[in-house]
Amino acid sequence: MIIFALIFGAIAIFTSFIYIEKVLPRLLCTFISGVILVGSIGGIVGNYYDHFGMHKVTETTIQKIYSADTTGKMNMILFQPIGTAGKENVYIFTRHENAKKVSHTKANEYTSNKITLTKGSEATLKTTKVRWQYKSNAYKFWFGIANNNNKLIKRTNRFYIPKNWFVLSTQQAKELKKKMSSSSFQAKAKEEAAAYVESKIKAAIVQDPSLMTDKNRQKKLTQQLAAEYQAKLLKETVSKIK
């Protein structure tokens, strides 16, 4: 609407100055038209540069997120450095359990990302967005043609990640996958896992002889120890590629 006021003011000031013969009415109409014209220009400039008629609105959302490993074998969040300086990262994760497609944060001048390690068991993403919004419908009516309502100023993504998760670059993840996929690594891991479980089972039987004849407990303990070794091996392998 402000554009129409600007056009009206320009036409009115021209018409008043040229076509109204009587001095007093001409001056009065020219003055009023000038106020409309200058006011419109001032409003447009103020809205464009200083967001006249607008205020900042903050919106915060919190959601549970899941591992970037869609196979479900590892709990991890990945990051990809962007820009030549490498000071900012795009983070990769999944938004739903058992999701086959990963999500990632935006890569633009409005977005910043932060990682906080927690003692909790769930990973969450807290997103805070700051936008420009019109203070009232009246301001929106006058300046809405600029299409700047709800314009994003800043987006902050804060990831709260459990300490037992891995935070890896995409390059590190590729190296890890390559290493763990090698036949020599898998053969060695299988051998070491068997030895680890066997030694722990023997130690448990020494402490509790009844375990020797309890096959169900042995099976459960074996599965627990195998998972324990897997986690230990994974942690050691990741530490070597960092």
Each predicted region: which residue ranges?
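Transmembrane alpha-helices and immediately adjacent membrane-cytoplasm interface residues
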Residues: 33-53
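Short extracytoplasmic
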Residues: 65-93
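Extracytosolic and intramembrane catalytic regions of membrane-associated proteins
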Residues: 94-242
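Juxtamembrane transmembrane-helix termini
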Residues: 18, 22-25, 49, 53
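Membrane-embedded alpha-helical segments of integral membrane proteins
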Residues: 1-23, 42
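Membrane-interfacial entry segments at the cytosolic side of transmembrane helices
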Residues: 25-33
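Alpha-helical transmembrane signal-anchor/signal-peptide segments
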Residues: 46-72
